[in-house]
Amino acid sequence: MARQLRQIKAHGGAFQQFCRCVVSRALPELVFSVLQEGHQGNKGLSAPQLLHRNHENGPANGISMRTYSSAILFLIATTMWAPKASAADEVAAEVNGRFKQATNRTFKAFNQQREQTWQQPFFFFQLADTQYGMFTGNKGFEKEAALAQQAVKHINRLRPRFVIVCGDLTQASPEQARYRAQVAQYHQDFSKVDPEIPLVCVCGNHDIGNRPTPKSIASYSENFGDDYFSFWVGGVCNVVLNSSVLKDPTGAPEVLAAQQKWLEQQLRSAKAAKARHILLFQHHPLFLTKENEPDQYFNIPLARRTPLLDQLKRADVRAVFAGHYHRNAYGRAGSMEMITTGPVGKPLGKDASGFRIVIVHKANIQHQYYGMDDVPKTIDLTKATQTVEPTQQ
């Protein structure tokens, strides 16, 4: 029997799955039948009565020593190994708990009722374009992983109120073969962010495709939650949009229509609740430097940009944060800032890989982009100065 148990244990995870099934279904019947074996006096007794009787009398109660020992050893084996969850189970639980908090168009980490009231100045990190696989054209992602891990260390050291990653989490799209491996690495790296620091993910064109469809959006949602949603932090209303359907809605016009209707409701609610600031986050910049600049790959087409800008201005949106450009850019539409942030991953300009730190004061916001090697040791929340517009690279 000892040799058999060693062989069973060597099969590891398969035996654990078997044991979970046995413990929940077969084991009670097995123990009951074993205890009844070989003795008429045991017939008709309940399981608790049988256990008590055999505890007192043991094998002398008419059960063979071999049968009795087998039952005990089997019970020990299932007790030792059945409760252990597999590594895959643990990863799945981590994904569902950490990376899918965007649900029902809100973000579960924040209590909206409590967070609608201004409390005190705070800061958050805005990241963009981790884009695992871009350095090598989807052949590997060692450089992206190293940069992401460096960013995570800065996050855990400085402890922002939250972290938001503005799209293109991976280079591969859901229909491509390397997508799952890149998502798994993203999950592995960003699961190291302290659990007390909420991690917000935003979809980009690489995450759902340049012409997104309901199917590609659903694939993204399986790994990262909703594609658009809102959440409140310390009196500030934060709105996350799916900018890929703004860029090209032809594959999912119904998604764009639903998002636009939802956005109008969110902006009205934020104004009615007297939000201290309204901030908007998406992957594509609405524009890079000028609100009426011509259409190009890195901005939203004027046909949808202009009415959206009018909508945001009417709602007194303070700033829009984006990525996609793989370098920094800055512009204004009236009093609203359009802030485009460089990449955690591969840069396409002079800006080094890095991220933006945003300080939120009661009257204004400050923000500064830092390369990975230039991140400050501390964040001073006492200085309420205006942000200096960055030079475009």
Regions found by a protein language model. Name each.
Residues 82-88:
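Boundary at the C-terminal end of the N-terminal hydrophobic targeting segment
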Residues 129, 167-168, 204-205, 283, ...:
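Active-site glycine-centered loops adjacent to acidic/histidine catalytic or metal-binding residues
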Residues 63-72:
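Bacterial N-terminal signal peptides that target proteins for export
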Residues 19-21:
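Cysteine-centered motifs
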Residues 91-116, 174-276, 298, 303-319, ...:
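Extended active-site neighborhood of metal-dependent phosphoesterases/phosphodiesterases
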Residues 88-179:
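N-terminal active-site segment of His-dependent metallophosphoesterases
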Residues 71-80:
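Bacterial N-terminal signal peptides
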Residues 165, 270-290:
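Short acidic, glycine-rich surface-loop motifs adjacent to enzyme active sites
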